Swiss-Prot record:
One of its GO terms (biological process) is glycine decarboxylation via glycine cleavage system. Keywords: Oxidoreductase, Pyridoxal phosphate. The gene is gcvP. Coiled coil: none annotated. It holds the Pfam family GDC-P. The modification N6-(pyridoxal phosphate)lysine is found at residue 704. The keyword Phosphoprotein does not apply. This is Glycine dehydrogenase (decarboxylating). Its cofactor is pyridoxal 5'-phosphate. One of its GO terms (cellular component) is cytosol. Its EC number is 1.4.4.2. SUPFAM superfamilies: PLP-dependent transferases (SSF53383).
Amino acid sequence: MTTPTEFQFTDYQPYDFANRRHIGPSPAEMAEMLKVIGYNSLEGLIDATLPPAIRQKAPLVWGAPMTEREALDKLRETANKNKVLVSLIGQGYYGTITPPVIQRNILENPAWYTAYTPYQPEISQGRLEALLNYQTMVCDLTGLDIANASLLDEATAAAEGMAMAERVAKSKAKAFFVDADCHPQTIALIRTRAEPLGWSVIVGNPFTDLDPVDVFGAIFQYPGTHGHVHDFTGLIARLHQAGAISVVAADILALTLLKSPGEMGADIAVGSSQRFGVPVGYGGPHAAFMAVRDAIKRAMPGRLVGVSVDARGNRAYRLSLQTREQHIRREKATSNICTAQVLLAVMASMYAVFHGPDGIKAIAQQVHQKAVLMAKGLEKLGYKVEPESFFDTITVDVGHMQGLILRAAVAEGVNLRKVGETKIGMSLDERTRPATLEAVWRAFGGNFTIADFEPSYRLPKALLRTSEYLSHPIFHMNRAESEMTRYIRRLSDRDLALDRAMIPLGSCTMKLNATAEMLPITWPEFSDIHPFVPADQALGYREMLDDLTEKLCAVTGYDAFSMQPNSGAQGEYAGLLTIRNYHIANGEGHRDVCLIPTSAHGTNPASAQMVGMKVVVVKVRENGDIDMEDFRAKAEEHAANLSCCMITYPSTHGVFEETVKEICELVHKHGGQVYLDGANMNAMVGLSRPGDIGSDVSHLNLHKTFCIPHGGGGPGMGPIGVKAHLAPHLPGHPETDGRPGAVSAAPFGSASILPISWSYCLMMGGEGLTQATKVAILNANYIATRLKGAYNVLYKSKTGRVAHECIIDTRPLVDSSGVTVDDVAKRLIDCGFHAPTMSWPVAGTLMIEPTESETKAELDRFCEAMLAIREEARAIEDGRMDKTNNPLKNAPHTVEDLVGEWDRPYSREQACFPPGAFRVDKYWSPVNRVDNVYGDRNLICTCPPVESYAEAAE
């Protein structure tokens, strides 16, 4: 031990978020990794990876990076500029109570929020069960046969319902009827969706204005946006007689007291599960739902959880009917829906489990009683309350007093809804207190208390619900919080999320979702703001949105952004609509051809189809680059009608193509616009800007590049950036600027998760974001280098480099050993890893994206696992292992395998503890390999009957 002669200060920064917390490898580890790859410096690797022509000229510079504490202080200062009033605005957004056991153990739990979409069912059984509970809940309450596992928001679900109605209707009409009592944002989104497809939208009173022979479908709001509760049974019957489809947009809480849409004969029901314990959050995120009749289930959009069996015959859950989806069907898909709202659907399903049918019914009754009491007080003041029958929403005509009363209510701490120029609306909810009613009465000039009135009900007797719901045992479990906590824990333990291991999914960017970034989303100043409050009550939100927009413009080289799209797919849709509207404004509405490479994300052609574009497919060369000869020929062939091209950069093959500028120039030469898919932006931030390359519009996946967690399949955010000439054509919204083109129910999409991306930017700074990009490229090249002797890295640049991801070819194993890409993926589960992206963009391959957040130790563990798998395949090739009875074909191995009778020609240790697997903290798959074919042939998409649990236990 040495004794220092004088005190020395250290330059170590313990709270340097970018270099100590977000970026995985240490400087010493980076040096080791660079040596393996063959470079002396990180800059040397970056120079070899990115073509000089696409490098941005100036560094990404803004204020110095903040520590976690400084960023949280900044977020708190900003949040405090929002005013949290009691909002009775309604219009699809309501106060609700998130049970603390759900907030702490799901919303704030990385085991739930860092998981990926459950494409690998064996390691997703927990959230698949929670989603099956959600589907069962929705089916029960809507009275329909089958429900999906969530959509983006109620208005989007309504637009999807219209599109589905057109697909399945026997009627050949090209018009869709919309109940004028639908929420305004729903009407706006339906108009947006219908116009490019050539469908006319008729808005009116369904009882006087609907002629079923003129439409392919109709949507009714139940209860209506202004409170009316109507029986649509007769109208639905008339629609069916005309070969048209009925859609009912229903309030999920009201359905506990009211006759279900299914009992009215509805074909499709849509709505939001927000009021089942999910905060309003200035518009989102919230899980929408869709339920349909069994006969039309294959035309339903979105993901669908079903029941199957595993290799032992035990019950297992999986995503069913995936051939409907965009990643397989592309432009023929039912929708471009990709990321949905899984985390929020899980919360809503747990709200139903937490309360059970009795609890939810009691909440609904209490909400209704509050609304009746509110009406009685207003009637005592001499106002006529409309409608006569209602659930939670009433409207009063106050004439010229509207503004005065609205301001008086705000002074009392309450937001009411402005309806037209003379009316005021209000929607009561679970959080409404007696003091709130009395405050509203004072705003109207009253001075009495809630004790002055007797509770009663004003629901129409003919529509009172008599059918059961939530009858499955899962909704009748013991209400003790200890049981609820353990149930949530049991489900999360079945899943593999980022809190356990790296998830190296190519094109998915499963990077760190730092705890400091997540904390603010549950602050009331962000979570309890209604999306339609007056602007002066959301100044903090606006400040954050403005600064985040400025930062994203700096990152991308674009001039303007819209934060409205609430998923990447919605961003594509919004961007293509923007291009379409630009052409129309220039008198070139005939431009409807979209050039898309065969390697594109499946959402690209699906989104193009949704805006009425004709998809022309461009070939890709053997090296993964776009075939410029074919691209040039098709651009010239369709020059007169060319609307745009859609490209991904770096390419979906994980390489920076050198012809990207030439592509942009060629499209512009022929009058088109360039849409650059921002899914791979994690390889560009700080190094290259789409707007400088020649792109006109991009969406950014904030749930990839900018740290919003994937949530097991949502939420996400897909804001779009555009060059100045496209800015006037960005989406509008009826509640803000009144312009057309809304693509999400709320003006700023899922606004309450934007603090995550903003705090990430604040803590990283421009220099940190740039370093993150460089390390993402380093990590991918390190893996590619370590694996290249065992596997062929399919695509590389001229310099032999990959971008932020690499594709390894497992196809040769099929011929040499019979080992498929599925076998490799399932064997990785035994090693404690989520498989990389399988069979995309090339069948039989694995696309690996490690991100910048993974340490060298974790990268090495993954490489050891992949190398060991190759050795197992080699043992099959050499005859040292059986070709069908081996660890790869039998993977994943479960505890049941370990303790059961062992008759396999390899050891238990080899099966369960391959290289890469932890011994002490090993992840065990809860099921063996899931039978996909069985699940689709025997489709069950609600909770199995209780008898099946007994059978499974035998």
